[in-house]
Amino acid sequence: AFKQLSKIYDTYVLSAAPWENPSAWSDKLNWVKNYLGKEAYKRLILSHNKHLNSGDYLIDDRKANGAEHFPGQHIYFGKDEFPDWKSVCDYLISQSI
């Protein structure tokens, strides 16, 4: 999904990690490197204040860490309207036309 949407949008990976688990930060970075590749590696933002980032869309499976106050549209991943990545990609591709 990241690679597909990156062809259309200026995409970033915005994630939070527990403060009390320092290895979680490096674990997230390694996960992005391994699964999303070098294109995403330098587009990783780790923040507990997601609402401070600007953008048109935030895809998140939670409303925590500022997602509920994000200034663009929060695509609530895993819920009724967006149960999977196909539904998210289909929606975002339709919005780009």
Regions found by a protein language model. Name each.
Residues 1-26, 32:
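Substrate-recognition element of Asp-dependent hydrolases with the DxDx(T/V) motif
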